Amino acid sequence: MKSIYITGYMGAGKTTIGKALSKELHMDVIDTDQKIEEKQEKEIRDIFAEEGEMAFREYESEMLRSLPVENVIITTGGGIIEREENRKWMKENGTVVYLYCDPHVIAERLREDTTRPLFQKKDIDAFVMKFELRRAYYEEAHIHIDTTNKSVKQIMDELKEKINE
């Protein structure tokens, strides 16, 4: 089976759904952000602070290409889709899943989360604007799932149905 790439904006449920799907399909799950932190030996927020977003995006592209393209679920950072080369790579090497969640719901979830570098010191309008700028890229995915106000079970049922189509 080709890899399954789970994309979506921060807070949409990528990590949670990736873990749940991993159990259902008996496949390993790899988180690109976690792998970058391990390789760079620092947290993402520190990479952003010390090296900037462009350096992080380069690490992200390198990491994406280093991962297996079969029998694995890959949960991605929210901005991985900003680079056309990344979108193309994922579409050519697996099934891309876009987890959509209303940006106002996400903002409420993340308001106090200090581990989210692009959410820090941003107002809701700027957050929603960044979300909307990325939306067309996310929508290039093979499968779209709206996670807004849904349980993990509801999301998983819908995702399994769409994967098996």
Curated annotation (Swiss-Prot):
Binding site for ATP: G11, A12, G13, K14, T15, T16, R116
Gene Ontology BP term (one): aromatic amino acid family biosynthetic process
Alphabetized UniProt keyword annotations: Amino-acid biosynthesis, Aromatic amino acid biosynthesis, ATP-binding, Cytoplasm, Kinase, Magnesium, Metal-binding, Nucleotide-binding, Transferase
An MF annotation (GO) of this entry: shikimate kinase activity
Amino acids binding substrate: D33, R57, G78, R134
InterPro entries linked to this entry: P-loop_NTPase, Shikimate/glucono_kinase, Shikimate_kinase/TSH1
Reactions the enzyme catalyzes: shikimate + ATP = 3-phosphoshikimate + ADP + H(+)
Keyword Cell division in annotation: no
Cofactor: Mg(2+)
Record-level GO cellular component terms: cytosol
Cofactor note text: Binds 1 Mg(2+) ion per subunit.
Binding site for Mg(2+): T15
Compartments (UniProt record): Cytoplasm
EC number: 2.7.1.71
Pfam families reported in the protein's UniProt record: SKI
Chief localisation class: cytoplasm
Pathway: Metabolic intermediate biosynthesis; chorismate biosynthesis; chorismate from D-erythrose 4-phosphate and phosphoenolpyruvate: step 5/7
PANTHER family registered for this protein in UniProt: SHIKIMATE KINASE, SHIKIMATE KINASE 1, CHLOROPLASTIC
Function: Catalyzes the specific phosphorylation of the 3-hydroxyl group of shikimic acid using ATP as a cosubstrate.
Family: Belongs to the shikimate kinase family.
Quaternary structure (record): Monomer.
The name this protein goes by in its record: Shikimate kinase
Gene, per the UniProt record: aroK
